[in-house]
Amino acid sequence: MKPNLYICHTAYQVLVDLLRAGRCVGKPHTMVLSASVPDTAALAARLDATGVVKTVLVDETRWPGTVTGLFAHRRAARAFEKLCGWKLNRAAFENVYIHNDWSVLGRYLQDCRAGYILCEDTFGSTLGPDQHLVTDQRTAADFAAKQRGKGYLYWGDSPWCVRVESEDAARCTLFSADRMVTDSKAKLLESLTDDEKAMVRRVFLTQPLPEKADGATLLLPRSFVADGLMTQA
């Protein structure tokens, strides 16, 4: 089986994709790190050392624009490749995974007409009560034209998005059932082996943990309690 391609914009996305890649045949898989990931170069070196992935660094800020007119998608793709220094060979990968298809890299996938799988950008994000970005996009006047490939659509609505992942596909009403797939990050993190935990520590811990952690505070990036994903206890 061919290796997979994982495109990451945050450390959380790197974490879950590293673990998923480690459980898939075809290693080493390719992981594209956006320059938005903190301490990108040092993190890439630690990721490469695992043997699970080989990293590619892409600075999306080098291509912040868009192209319109005849063959716009082809010209936009060539501009991205020239300025950002990376070119996708879709035939080399089994699956292409991205968490943020509204990004420059996401638009590049659409310009390449590359079938991709949209992953949740944060834990359980497809199950949140506020999905106005998707619903507003679908009521826009140019939505039908963009569905035919004239422009970009995001958050799983692009015709080049082949599947959408959810923590629980049965509870997600944003897309038709045939496009949804369940990929539970909670189950993934709960099932880590000792070897996987050691790999995560080697990649993400840059200094030893304190022996005494009394009074330590855990800062969560969103309200897991309000989302019903964590209890107060």
Indicate residue ranges for each PLM-predicted region.
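Active-site and donor-binding regions of nucleotide-sugar-utilizing enzymes
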Residues: 5-156
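Short glycine-rich anion-binding loops that position phosphate/pyrophosphate groups of nucleotides
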Residues: 102, 223-225
